Amino acid sequence: NPCCDAATCKLKSGSQCGHGDCCEQCKFSKSGTECRASMSECDPAEHCTGQSSECPADVFHKNGQPCLDNYGYCYNGNCPIMYHQCYDLFGADVYEAEDSCFERNQKGNYYGYCRKENGNKIPCAPEDVKCGRLYSKDNSPGQNNPCKMLCSNEDEHKGRFLEQTGRGKVCSNRQ
């Protein structure tokens, strides 16, 4: 390391730092230099302070802050909305399904439920149907499935947390 004296394991005279995201040529990076890029609208970029070689802690916007033109709300640095979850699970040309698909979540069976309690599938209340199993519409050529779902015994593929489900309502804890 050109900033350190190998014999003493200390910084050389005139060096402020030897490593770090905010260390350039043995000096602290200028204040305002980006050291961690934004990962989403809810995760702002971090910038060097000019007083340290380390990038400040990764911080997110407060959970519940509106994002994506008020379509969703920030949650742990992301703006979770159903379109993104459909895309993540099924790929391009797949979108949130029609409301009628989500009504299946009132049945409390493998094909539709809100949550599990002691192994039992609990149906969604009518106002919570978009907080249960996720349904997507596949617009790919040759596909004709308006209510596509991931067939899995796992309980993770649910409507995303903190998405607006109408008139200021959001999903939280699958309700």
Swiss-Prot record:
One of its GO terms (biological process) is proteolysis. Its main location: secreted. Its EC number is 3.4.24.-. Ca(2+) binds at D43, P44, E46, D58, V59. A motif (D/ECD-tripeptide) lies at residues 41-43. Monomer. This is Zinc metalloproteinase-disintegrin-like catroriarin. It comes from Crotalus atrox (Western diamondback rattlesnake).
